[in-house]
Amino acid sequence: MYVGTRRIDKASELIKPEDELEIRGKSNPYASRGGLKLEKAITSFQADLRGKVCMDIGAATGGFTDVCLQNGAAHVYAIDVGYGQFSWKLRNDPRVTLYERTNARLLTPDMLPLHPTVTVMDVSFISIRLILPVAAQLMGEEGVFYTLIKPQFEAGRDRIGKKGVIHDPKVHEDVLREIVEFAPTIGWQGEQLDYSPIKGPGGNIEFLGKITVRTQETEPVTPEIIHELVKKAHQELKGSSHK
């Protein structure tokens, strides 16, 4: 959305009544470009959100919330530490409860009258490992995570390249392995992984994960699976010669 040459990217941004608005670029069926990432996760992991109560942690403009609703979710708790970004349309949707200026690590059951069993997550400047235990406790054993994994916020400064971009596929492998190894420490497991169809800021390759309660019926993701996934992601998104 543009006013003249100025890009409008926040719902809270003020414009004049006489300003002419222009929509540029390819049409997106969701409230943000990020929705395309969760869309792939739902397809890849065969997620069924019909009738489910979901938490969208790191809701921002509402792309993930929009995907949940368009895939049949009964209600979405949209949670974000920021404010003023969330889609006006979604903000006024009775199926959405919006918590702005809210730290997901401080969520308590009394804040969520409807019991969520699905968490979708897209967070920045924090590791998902700090949020998984809280959300897992809120959802209980029937819960499932569909999360975006941003290596640039998982790896630590010593493993990140210039301008916050990770180019080394080995670092991507390490990050995914560390998350898969972390899940069992809270009684969960990394069940499936894929890569995001679009890059993040600066051209960062990002990944998608399905994390569920640990059972004997499902096999966790192995290092070999991670290696092949990262290899494919680099080939598809960067033309890397990762071996």
Locate predicted features.
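Flexible, glycine-/basic-rich loop-and-beta segments that form/coincide
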Residues: 205, 211-243
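Conserved class I S-adenosyl-L-methionine
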Residues: 49-60
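S4-like RNA-binding module at protein N-termini
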Residues: 1-49
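Conserved SAM-binding loop of SAM-dependent methyltransferases across substrates and taxa
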Residues: 61-72
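Short alpha-helix
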Residues: 172-186
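A short glycine-rich, Lys/Arg-flanked "PGG" loop and its adjoining helix->strand segment in the class I
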Residues: 129-146
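S-adenosyl-L-methionine
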Residues: 77-130
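Short, glycine-/aromatic-enriched active-site segment of Class I SAM-dependent methyltransferases
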Residues: 151-168
